[in-house]
Regions:
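Phosphate- and other anionic-substrate recognition elements at nucleic-acid/protein interfaces
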Residues: 1-231
Length: 231
């Protein structure tokens, strides 16, 4: 099993690939937004994506002050880690190997938002290691992921959502989420609904892990991941 995470404070997402000798390869797409519109949640339910709203208001630094803000984020980070680790535990059977991959922070990132992200992600990964759920952990730079997706370099900087577009062209061929993205069924007015970018990035994290680690880790072949990237 490979679980690729696009980890964020507001709307973390995961693409879990399970390789079974008898059942073949299966994909789970799941996200845990702080909050999401009912119309968006309904669209996800219609294309095989599990979307669990945490029903949280944003933490207000002004209203709570620095100390209370830090404590609020730590409590939320711990609660989120418990939710995600509980879900991973429910998907992992005895004898399964679980590899967890995530995207690293971009070079030059700074500010409170990045500090909070590092806190949430650190609490999550520490929890994985503490309970021994993951057999190995991997982290990849944003540039590495973009290279795997075929959209690295200056030529793609002007494009609005290259990782989403690449997913629509190259995502798992039998999954309804791929079809929904390819046919632009998850757009509200002129923009993608919340979490589409996170779910697509999570897929590219998973695919990056497979490509980079398959020789060393002995992953079973995943046909969709072996295909040439359509550009």
């Amino acid at each position: 099993m490979i679980a690729g995470f696009d980890f964020s404070v507001a709307k973390p997402a995961c693409c879990l690939v399970t390789m079974d000798a008898a059942a073949g390869v299966s994909y789970d797409f799941i996200c845990w937004p702080q909050d999401i519109k009912k119309s968006a949640a309904a669209k996800y339910a219609g294309c095989g994506v599990s979307c669990y709203s945490r029903n949280l208001e944003p933490v207000s630094h002004v209203a709570e002050g620095s100390t209370e803000t830090v404590k609020a984020h730590i409590r939320r980070a711990m609660a989120l880690a418990d939710i995600i680790n509980g879900w991973l535990s429910s998907r992992k059977n005895d004898g399964d190997l679980l590899y967890v991959a995530s995207e690293g922070l971009s070079f030059g990132s700074k500010g409170d938002a990045v500090t909070n992200l590092a806190t949430y992600k650190g609490v999550f990964l520490a929890g994985l290691m503490r309970i021994g759920l993951a057999d190995d952990l991997f982290t990849y730079s944003p540039t590495t992921m973009k290279s795997v997706a075929g959209c690295a370099g200056k030529a793609f900087r002007s494009l609005k959502d290259p990782m989403i577009e690449r997913f629509g062209q190259n995502g798992p061929s039998e999954h309804p989420f791929t079809w929904a993205v390819r046919n632009r069924r998850l757009i509200a007015k002129t923009a993608w609904i919340d979490c589409v970018d996170d779910l697509c990035d999570a897929y590219w994290v998973t695919r990056t892990c497979y490509i980079k680690e398959k020789d060393m880790s002995g992953f079973p072949e995943i046909p969709d991941f072996e295909k040439e990237i359509i550009i």
